[in-house]
Amino acid sequence: MRTGGRPGRVNAVRVIAGLAVVALTATACAGEQVTGELQTVGEVAGLPVTHFESGLKDDAAKPDVRAEGATDAVEDRLALASIADVTDYWDEQMPEHFGEKFEHVDKLMSYDPEGEAQEVCGTSTRDMALNAFYCPPEDLVAWDRGVLLPLLREKFGDMAVAAVLAHEFGHAVQTRLGEKAGIDGGTSTIVKEQQADCFTGSYMRWIAEDKSKYFELSTSDGVNEVLGALFLIRDAPGSHANEQGAHGSGFDRTYAVQLGFEEGAKRCAEIDKTEVDERITEVPFKNATDQAQQGQAPITGGTMVHVQRSLDQAFSATGVDPPQIVEGDGTCQQGRSTPPVSYCEQNNEVHIDLTTLEKIGQPADQVGELTGKNSPDAGLGDFAVFSEVASRYVQGIQKGVGAPTEGGQAGLRTACLVGAWAKFANNPDSGSTLYLSPGDLDEAIAELLQPRSLLAADINGHRVANGFARIEALRNGYLEGSSVCTETYK
């Protein structure tokens, strides 16, 4: 994030007053620290929230699929099952939505980049670590079983393998659909990637509806893991969406996956340059200073003054007495505490533990994330911290207007209002003392996916169970503004 700007008052955040206050008994005693209990709330794109271990079904048959170089390793077994399954999916979807038969992918290849070098699609496998790809000239899908798939399984579980290969099959589908998906030789990479991510989401919905012979996917942790896996493989902050090879920011990638999960494969094929240009958030750094700092502001008391001012400006139209951000140990002397950031009702203050927040706010080590060798000093970035602080600040705003502050809907409304604040801070005419930098929205999503995150938690620190709903709430606030927060999360 960047500091600066002029004082201003913009009606960017409109909280509807007069909401009925839900009377819930608080169990926290004086000074009690409340842990992040999970809450199941609502649905996931029309499906019930389910809780079970996702992955291969116990009774799944051995797939009748062969791939060059495949071994009996669990990663290859998962890959072959994934390919059999996503092929079944497209055998069904292509005739139904596009009026044609799905021609199966011609070649499949498994390789270990640390093993014997092989040439595939004009490149040595030694140079293709951490990769899975579709090669149009050879109609081939290949995957790195030695580094990438083990890393994905370790971090996100078996469904991450299915998600990554489904994405590559999405590119094969594009090649077959051609003009039916608006794809030709001049189509930009980012449009192709957004479509492929969307196709992945539509396939995951099919599994979640229990239509797969091979896999089962819960709509809580299972969907969370799929989103986390695709979020991991995102472009670096400051990348431009129009660059050749751009895959999109984490914010943009998760949006496309959720779009497919919600609206299906036919909608994915409608994604075009006009749509992508209107909503894509991946932009380069605005100046040399921002690039040199990689968009990171120090987590200091001085920076928190800017956070306070920006939040006050954004929510001034509510007429609510703004909570004050106070340095300390991040706890309240009385009532609920959710360190390292707590909203203290008795004095309308947000207490922060700056030492802990400084560690969280260290720049992310994206290369380390991808290689599984994350630096011990790496954090999530400055906006991960600022969004956490904002999540407790808006407890005071919601309380001030009489909105419920406990329960799952309150947690989602919180994430939505943080997104609305980010929208305010991204508006150069808002007068905000803080402005978004490239990568800030990804830092917020990274924070949302943390097990300790308060970003989609109610006043007690109880967070919503499914990451799909958490990310969707943040995105709704950012794209639509605050009115959608109170209209959607009542």
Regions found by a protein language model. Name each.
Residues 81, 93-95, 191-193, 197-235, ...:
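Short helix/loop segments within enzyme catalytic domains
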Residues 67-68, 72, 79-85, 97-121, ...:
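Acidic helix-start/capping segments at beta-turn-to-alpha-helix junctions
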Residues 146-163, 186-190, 360-388, 402-408:
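Short pre-active-site segment immediately N-terminal to the catalytic Zn-binding motif
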Residues 25-28:
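C-terminal motif of bacterial Sec signal peptides marking the signal peptidase cleavage site
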Residues 52-57, 234-322, 454-490:
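Pan-zinc metallopeptidase signature
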Residues 30-33:
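Bacterial signal peptide processing site
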Residues 113-142, 327-351, 358-366:
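Catalytic zinc-binding patch centered on the HExxH motif and its immediate surroundings
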Residues 169-184, 202, 207-208, 392-406, ...:
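Catalytic Zn2+-binding segment of zinc metalloproteases
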